[in-house]
Amino acid sequence: MEFSQKLYQAAKPIINDIYEDDFIQKMLLGNIQADALRHYLQADAAYLKEFTNLYALLIPKMNSMNDVKFLVEQIEFMVEGEVLAHDILAQIVGESYEEIINTKFWPPSGDHYIKHMYFQAHSRENAIYTIAAMAPCPYIYAELAKRSQSDHKLNREKDTAKWFDFYSTEMDDIINVFEALMNKLAESMSDKELEQVKQVFLESCIHERRFFNMAMTLEQWEFGGKVND
């Protein structure tokens, strides 16, 4: 079994939990609250900006020009392509995506997730650690979306179904590249090192779950007390 497949197998319980959590279940039914979607979009805009920067940090770690070219293309996709999925949710909220994200928001769950990825990028020379931290994002979105396609609860009469349709196909290219890179880099690593990479991957899976849940709880920073002067 290739290393990437071992990671996916280990992540299955977490992905199952994400699928059964309120965010995805309400998205399937099409009855998710507008406030939750607004919260998600504002947080995701901040997250994706940093995720794009992480692609740029990966480029110097690449040995192949083809890999560099693909990462540059992914930066373009993050800036332009994924806006289609965001527009779907913004229309449900009843506001333009630009209006929604004009309110800057950096929730605890997004903060911790991004710092986890930046730590790998800055503290590890081997690119596999950064890739392992980033890879769960597209992989989990794709897995959730593909599972939804055969779920009788997916309400085709609601616009949220279009969000699942988008992610059921649009993540495939980056998933395949991340898989190939991780599998290639894993070949020269010890079992102990691969366990560390696995830990990084699974931690990002947990961060993904917390990110979705953040939207449902309208997560804010809590510094103690009702008023902080």
Curated annotation (Swiss-Prot):
Pfam short name (any one): TENA_THI-4
The record places the site described as Increases nucleophilicity of active site Cys at 47
Alphabetical list of SUPFAM superfamilies matching this protein:
Heme oxygenase-like
Keyword field contains Transport: no
Catalytically driven reaction(s): 4-amino-5-aminomethyl-2-methylpyrimidine + H2O = 4-amino-5-hydroxymethyl-2-methylpyrimidine + NH4(+); thiamine + H2O = 5-(2-hydroxyethyl)-4-methylthiazole + 4-amino-5-hydroxymethyl-2-methylpyrimidine + H(+)
- Example GO biological process: thiamine diphosphate biosynthetic process
Q: Where is the signal peptide?
A: none
Where, by residue number, is the active site?
Answer: 137, 208
Q: What is its EC number?
A: 3.5.99.2
**Assigned GO CC terms:** cytosol
Task: Kindly give the NCBIfam families that the UniProt entry links to this protein.
Answer: salvage_TenA
Function in brief: Catalyzes an amino-pyrimidine hydrolysis reaction at the C5' of the pyrimidine moiety of thiamine compounds, a reaction that is part of a thiamine salvage pathway. Thus, catalyzes the conversion of 4-amino-5-aminomethyl-2-methylpyrimidine to 4-amino-5-hydroxymethyl-2-methylpyrimidine (HMP). Is also able to catalyze the hydrolytic cleavage of thiamine; however, this thiaminase activity may not be physiologically relevant. Therefore, is probably involved in the regeneration of the thiamine pyrimidine from thiamine degraded products present in the environment, rather than in thiamine degradation.
Listed under subunit, the entry gives: Homotetramer.
* Family listed: Belongs to the TenA family.
Any idea what this protein is called?
Aminopyrimidine aminohydrolase
